[in-house]
């Protein structure tokens, strides 16, 4: 069966700095009309940095939509224009943590909320780390947090970390065997 829904008309309701909201008139595979609310997003990256000792560097920051301060991997949105995912990941890693990486190992692409948003989030594992100075954006207030990878696994396992990109990055690192001896077995 072909599950494709055909777009009939797009009605843009809001155009912001990081997203656009539209309401589409569409046609279901059976020919019946429907309405689809869509949030267009620039896309972004998330980077899980793991050093040679199995330590990870995360960021703690307030996330306004949830009204909570959370712990997550360094991340950010893609800039308008030609910036590729790896370049964006390197930029965000340095801005938020001061780290630069010899290697940016792709962990894949995830779609955080495909039911209403077209955001594509590219995940990386950063290796060969060198510490430098942070350069946070003007509106960004973050704290660097270092911990063993095994401790991060425990925070994911218990649900203390709810951030989807962080959970996905930890899972991909484990599945791809990129944690080395710092895996979660001892937790």
Give the residues covered by each predicted segment.
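Unchanged
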Residues: 34, 43-46, 77-164
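Conserved Nudix-box catalytic region and its N-terminal flanking loop in Nudix hydrolases
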Residues: 2, 48-91, 134, 187
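Acidic, metal-coordinating catalytic segment for phosphate/diphosphate chemistry
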Residues: 9-46, 52-53
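Short beta-strand micro-motifs in enzyme catalytic cores
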Residues: 20-24, 69, 120-122, 143
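C-terminal boundary of histidine-terminating zinc-finger modules
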Residues: 170
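A short, amphipathic edge element
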Residues: 1-11
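Short loop segments at secondary-structure junctions
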Residues: 29-30, 51-53, 62, 126-131, ...
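Generic C-terminal helix-cap and adjacent flexible tail
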Residues: 175-187
